[in-house]
């Protein structure tokens, strides 16, 4: 039986992960390199678990922070927020949670193609580069589930003006998750 690795979501949220900064490099060294190895030429991380996985799980590791470094957080009633007086412009919870979920799924041995993209907040640069350099990278996958979100109760159907799923899929998923119709 493999030991339980506990990835620390709160610690992950402390990193301001603006693309190209020291704090994003530190984040990758601490959380992504030990699991994925080093990234491809476009700074994307990929790992395949299983013989013929049909599902791809995706997230991105950059944030819309405007500065480098660490941020202080407060935890109250199981809710994490920026500390009072914080100079940060965002918490960065959607992408940190996506990376955390992917790390936990990999550790649990869940079969799939795992992709963690770079520089998505600046116009999907990491995912576009992946498709440009390897247009057939997903041919064997039937489904892509991207752990990204907007606000607290949303299913994203478009990103950068590009449809990411049908309204029928979004409404069905919304019903399954108990969110009501979109």
Write out the residue ranges for each language-model feature.
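N-terminal, Lys/Arg- and Ser/Thr-rich interaction peptides
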Residues: 1-11
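A non-catalytic alpha/beta surface segment that caps or lines the substrate-entry region
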Residues: 11-53
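Intrinsic-disorder/low-complexity, polar/charged segments
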Residues: 18-21, 62, 167
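Short secondary-structure junctions
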Residues: 33-42, 77, 175-181
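General beta-strand structural signal in soluble alpha/beta enzymes
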Residues: 39-42, 57-59, 82-84, 114-116, ...
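Intrinsic disorder/low-complexity detector
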Residues: 42-48, 54, 64, 96, ...
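Active-site metal-coordination/substrate-binding segment of hydrolases
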Residues: 51-111, 122-123
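Acidic/histidine-rich catalytic neighborhood of metal-dependent amide-processing enzymes
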Residues: 87-91, 95-182
